[in-house]
Structure formats: C-alpha cells, structure tokens
Amino acid sequence: MFEKVNPCHPDKVADRIAGALVDLAYKKAENPRIAVEVLIGHGVCHIIAETSVSLDKADVTAAVHRIAGNLTIDYVEVPQDGHLADNQADGVRCGDNGIFKGMPMTEEQKTLSQIARDVFSVYPYDGKYILDGDRLILCQSNVETQHLREIYPDAEINPLGDWTGGTDVDTGATNRKLGSDMADSVTGGGLHGKDLSKADVSVNIYAFLKAQETGKPVTLCCAIGDNTVDGKPYTEIVETARSYIRSSGGFEKFAEWGLV
C-alpha cells in the first residue's frame, strides 16, 4: 500500500518553495546554514527562514511567484541560533539528533511512482494517487475523468467527480508529505527546506541510497555534533547527499518528488 502526490499538490508546492530558498542560499555560500518553513494557501504564503546568509527579498518573491503564482508573501528571516552555528564553526558536523531508516523500494512503490509521473506529465496539476495491491485510485485535478479512464480502465478515478485543487482549495505546509517522498524510509525528520549539514537531509539520503544498493534495510542514529555516521566521516555523508541533490537538479527539483 502506497500513496504518491505530484509536485502541484499544495504540500509539495510548499516543499518546492522551501527548496528554492535553499538553492538561493547555496548561490551565496558553499556551505550555508538554513532551515525554511512554508505555509501556503488561499492567496497567502508565510515563510520563516533561519539562515546564516541573508536572502534578497526580491529573489524570495520571484521564487514564490514562479512556483505558486502571484501570492501575498509574509517573509520572516532570522539568523541561525548561536549554539547551532558554533557546532559547525570548525567543520561540518552532524547538525541535529536523529533516527534514520533506509528501506529498499517495493515493486508496488516503483509502479505507483511511475504512474504518478506519467499522469503528471500530461496533466501538470494537483493530484494524489494510491496503489493497494490491485486497487489503483487516481485523484487528478483539472482533467475530465473519462480521459484518464481510457488510459487506466480498472482504476478508481476522481471518486467525487472532477475537481480543481491547488492552493485555493487546500493549504500546504513543508514536509507534510513524507510518506510520498520516502515511502517506508520515513522516520523522524523531513527532507525539505534544509541545508546539507542537517542530518534530516544528508543521512536520510545516504540511508535510502544504501538500502537501494544493498537491498537491505538500513537503520542509523546520530547525535548533534557527531563527526561520523555509519562508520563514515560526516563530511563523506554530506558529499554523498550533495551529489544526489545536484543530480536531481537542486533542492527545488528534489522537492518535486522526493526520494521515491
């Protein structure tokens, strides 16, 4: 049983905005410290950014408008806490306490992830999809149900009829669709709106990739300030995640679909 949402679901719109701001921070510094929370809906986008580099309000506004439309923006930016900053003063260390799990993807998860991408490539609007054994449920906005039924004749499609979706119908918040992003690898923390020093980003990515490579579950934990995780220097964990994010096209692009 697995649920997947597409990049235009309001929660994913929030994730994408958060990712775009992290991308902005990385344009200003090689290793910025930033954590972004976004709440969006009904014409308003609220953002709080804790960051070691100041972001230009015009760049923030441009990112929000590009991703979510011409919304009213409430942007609050504050410096990173001094104790947290001191943790990274002499090198990259684990940025938080955490527990982490990497799980090999199931065939069901792979199948639904591909279906979600296929549908979204034709209908780039808010949508949510479920696969439970042989039961496929497709909720796709801004489409005539009959069109999807021709492609997926055995699926349950838009059970309440055609709908519009988007942030004028539903609110979105950062890291609220972790099941969609991580499948069985969900544990304590979210992937989005954070720099690579954050274990929620780097260790989650590392554990997920290791699970796909080995075909076995991976369980890890770390304490803030740790220099090693899974017997590897934390800097190596971070570089693994950095390469993955780059291969995805950056933090905003990574936020579209997550790891799955």
Task: List the predicted regions and their residue ranges.
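A domain-level signal for the structural core that forms small-molecule/cofactor-binding pockets
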Residues: M1-V260
